[in-house]
């Protein structure tokens, strides 16, 4: 069995301290990358939070009641789709 001297141990630790940061830079970011779907979900969550903080004007749609409230973006989109469908059906 080979015994390491003090100089061998210090040289190994010095080499390890020089290589370890580059190894961390190479391997750690790839393990922490989020999938694209989670980024989209995060962006949607931010958008919904922004939309919920905006006070809305009443909807100009004859078949739907006018709504004054803080609503989410999804609610707005469904109301707009319903309004467009009703408008197309009338013509």
From Swiss-Prot:
Keywords on record: Cytolysis, Host cell lysis by virus, Host cell membrane, Host membrane, Host-virus interaction, Membrane, Transmembrane, Transmembrane helix, Viral release from host cell
Record field: transmembrane: 9-29
Subcellular location: Host cell membrane
Membrane topology: Single-pass type I membrane protein
Impact after mutating residue 27 to A: Delayed lysis onset
Periplasmic topological segments: 1-8
Any one GO MF annotation of this record: enzyme inhibitor activity
Coiled coil: none
Ranges in the topological domain labelled Cytoplasmic: 30-91
GO cellular component terms listed in the entry, alphabetical order: host cell plasma membrane; membrane
InterPro entries recorded: Micrvir_lysisE
Domain of life of the organism encoding this protein: Viruses
Additional remark text: Most of the references in this paper show that residue 89 is Arg, in most other phiX174 proteomes the residue is Gln. We have chosen to show Gln at this position.
Quaternary context: Oligomerizes. Interacts (via N-terminal) with host SlyD; this interaction protects E from proteolysis and stabilizes the YES complex. Interacts (via transmembrane region) with host MraY; this interaction inhibits MraY by blocking lipid access to the active site. Part of the YES complex composed of 2 host Mray molecules, 2 lysis protein E molecules and 2 host SlyD molecules.
Entry similarity comment: Belongs to the microvirus E protein family.
Purpose of the protein: Induces host cell lysis. Inhibits the host translocase MraY activity that catalyzes the synthesis of lipid I, a necessary step for the host cell wall biosynthesis.
Protein name, entry field: Lysis protein E
């Amino acid at each position: 069995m080979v015994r390491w001297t003090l100089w061998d141990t210090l040289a190994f630790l010095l080499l390890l301290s020089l290589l370890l940061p580059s190894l961390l830079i190479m391997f750690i970011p790839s393990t922490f990358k989020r999938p694209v779907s989670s980024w989209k979900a995060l962006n949607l969550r931010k958008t919904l939070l922004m939309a919920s903080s905006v006070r809305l004007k009443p909807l100009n749609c004859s078949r739907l009641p006018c709504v004054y409230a803080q609503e989410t973006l999804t609610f707005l989109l469904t109301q707009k789709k319903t309004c467009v469908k009703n408008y197309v059906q009338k013509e």
